[in-house]
Amino acid sequence: MKRTPHLLAIQSHVVFGHAGNSAAVFPMQRIGVNAWPLNTVQFSNHTQYGQWAGEVLAPAQIPALVEGISNIGELGHCDAVLSGYLGSAEQGRAILAGVERIKAVNPKALYLCDPVMGHPEKGCIVPPEVSEFLLDEAAATADILCPNQLELDSFCGRRAQSLEDCVNMARSLLQRGPQVVLVKHLAYPGRAEEHFEMLLVTAEHSWHLRRPLLAFPRQPVGVGDLTSGLFLARVLLGDSWVQAFEFTAAAVHEVLLETQACASYELQLVRAQDRIAHPRVRFEAQLLAL
């Protein structure tokens, strides 16, 4: 029997709706990966509603929980760590210590950092200390880095002006340590407005992918969290980088189609679960000569 991969997902959680682990854990489990959620914040709902209740996890709890998993002999079974939204830079450093601990017992374990800072259309949503931590410390530790356009621009200290510029900027991030950079959402000047564009860059190659941009009265939250989670899960299941890239684009599009059909502000993950596992659409990533 083929072994089920395990990953530790360290990011935000909402009680109602889907963001952070609430957007990523179920889809990862649905496609065959055992996700262990460790929630950096627990809020009633995502913050785009304008009001919420809840609290940030004390940073000391992260190593304590990792230690608890170690004490029952399970830490060595962890194949990857995923980190997303951080409530503080101190939380981030606790996560990196956890990554180091896991890699000490499983050197093959991967670390995917989703450097959540904000959205190209909404601006930065995290304190400066978190941005600085992501730029200066997290990127150097990550095996897989998954910024959006705002975050790519922040890492490189300037705004991208073209697709080629985005490729060069992503490639420059590889020099900090990651094996691969997945840009979840491109928003460079002159792009086709009717498409949603993504980029995958390794040291040897770069791939560009387009899917139709679906219209919503209010854009659903959690799409980036879903994207990062599915990409990492597919890699753990044995996909190549580009196979995971194409699967992720298709599965996320299926969720958005279901969400649009339901006229919902929240991602319709439960209704779309079979479409996540077996996407009916397919998008082919184009190898770029750049």
UniProtKB/Swiss-Prot annotation:
GO MF terms, alphabetically ordered: ATP binding; magnesium ion binding; pyridoxal kinase activity
Root EC class: transferase
Keyword Ribosomal protein carried by entry: no
Biological or metabolic pathway of the protein: Cofactor metabolism; pyridoxal 5'-phosphate salvage; pyridoxal 5'-phosphate from pyridoxal: step 1/1
Catalytic activity, reaction form: pyridoxal + ATP = pyridoxal 5'-phosphate + ADP + H(+)
EC number: 2.7.1.35
Disulfide bonds: none
Cofactor field: Mg(2+)
Binding site for substrate: S12, T47, Q48, D225
GO BP: pyridoxal 5'-phosphate salvage
CDD domains recorded: pyridoxal_pyridoxamine_kinase (cd01173)
Residues bound to ATP: D114, E151, K184, R211, P212, L213, L214
Keyword Kinase: yes
Role: Pyridoxal kinase involved in the salvage pathway of pyridoxal 5'-phosphate (PLP). Catalyzes the phosphorylation of pyridoxal to PLP.
Family the entry assigns: Belongs to the pyridoxine kinase family. PdxY subfamily.
Subunit: Homodimer.
Protein name: Pyridoxal kinase PdxY
